[in-house]
From Swiss-Prot:
Pfam families: RrnaAD
Functional summary from the UniProt entry: Specifically dimethylates two adjacent adenosines (A1518 and A1519) in the loop of a conserved hairpin near the 3'-end of 16S rRNA in the 30S particle. May play a critical role in biogenesis of 30S subunits.
Protein name: Ribosomal RNA small subunit methyltransferase A
Species of origin: Leifsonia xyli subsp. xyli (strain CTCB07)
Key word Signal present: no
EC class name: transferase
Binding-site residues for S-adenosyl-L-methionine, renumbered to this chain: 30, 32, 57, 78, 108, 125
Source taxon at top rank: Bacteria
Reactions accelerated catalytically: adenosine(1518)/adenosine(1519) in 16S rRNA + 4 S-adenosyl-L-methionine = N(6)-dimethyladenosine(1518)/N(6)-dimethyladenosine(1519) in 16S rRNA + 4 S-adenosyl-L-homocysteine + 4 H(+)
Gene behind the chain: rsmA
Gene Ontology molecular functions: 16S rRNA (adenine(1518)-N(6)/adenine(1519)-N(6))-dimethyltransferase activity; RNA binding
Length: 280
């Protein structure tokens, strides 16, 4: 594909001023101002010409243009009405030949139940404050998603990709593992954002499982156990799961029946352990 003119620092600030947008912490808005980083994300994500990609929080269009440059059809989900209205105009001005490959959905990503096309890949600079809920929601609601790369706060990304026994392994790690295999895919300098955030960022990639561990009911039961196990992570499972089963003795019996030692803690269990417990 031919290279497009991507957005730089001056263009980002000019666009924001033009439509009266001041980035807000409430919406987790930090706009990418570096074209090299945009192209790196697209490359790491393995975006191919002709495929449908969903982008959450396109903002002023930095990553959107990079995805279009790679030849993708882009479904961009934007909660801010001003940004949603402006994005097609920006693309029409900077990449008129690609404008027909962009569809903008003005919506909160957490409210999305279906999309205009069937995206196979997720590529996004996710708002820091809702990155995990958005990821889990889309993976639940958009079964066509098979892979993706997202940019998130470094601490959050490491938690998502963590395995059992890690200090940062927690509920997001287990829930993400329900849907696929996760990996960290490189750090990102905070200097490529406007405004510059107070935290570092990281790229996290995933490949979806060919089949999930169970149906929706089993997923809900598994996630409820995961939440209880990590609510007070220093407690043994016999204690932390007592509210779910009624008392510690009942929790201990359920754990033993599932082949899990009651004195273990949530951080020591794999997804398979939680699923086995939930299935009983």
């Amino acid at each position: 594909m031919n290279e497009l003119r991507l957005l730089g620092p001056a263009e980002i600030r000019d666009l924001a001023e033009l439509i009266g947008v001041a980035p807000t912490k409430r919406l987790g808005q930090n706009f990418v101002i570096d074209a090299n980083t945009v192209r790196r994300i697209v490359r790491v994500a393995g975006v191919e010409a002709g495929e449908v990609v969903v982008e959450v929080g396109p903002g002023l269009g930095s990553l959107t243009l990079g995805l279009l440059e790679a030849g993708a059809r882009v479904v961009a989900v934007e909660i801010d009405g001003r940004l949603a209205e402006r994005l097609p105009l920006t693309v029409a001005q900077l990449a008129p030949e690609a404008a027909g490959r962009l569809t903008v959905v003005h919506s909160d990503a957490l409210a999305v139940t279906e999309l205009p096309e069937r995206p196979g890949r997720l590529v996004a600079n996710l708002p820091y404050n809702v990155s995990v809920p958005v990821l889990l929601h889309l993976l639940e609601r958009v079964p066509s998603l098979r892979s993706g790369v997202v940019m998130v706060q470094a601490e959050v990304g490491q938690r998502i990709a963590a395995g059992p026994g890690s200090k940062v392994y927690g509920a997001p790690s287990v829930k993400a593992a329900w849907y696929g295999v996760w990996r960290t895919a490189g750090t990102v300098s905070r200097q490529i954002f406007w405004p510059v955030p107070n935290v570092d960022s990281i790229l996290v990639g995933f490949e979806r499982h060919a089949t999930e561990p169970g149906d929706d009911e089993l997923r809900k039961r598994t996630f409820a156990l995961v939440d209880a196990a990590f609510q007070q992570r220093r407690k043994t499972l016999r204690q932390s799961l007592a509210p779910v089963y009624g008392d510690p003795a009942a929790a201990g019996a359920a754990l033993e029946a599932a082949g899990v030692a009651p004195r273990r803690r949530g951080e020591q269990l794999t997804l398979a352990d939680f699923v086995r417990l939930a299935a009983r």
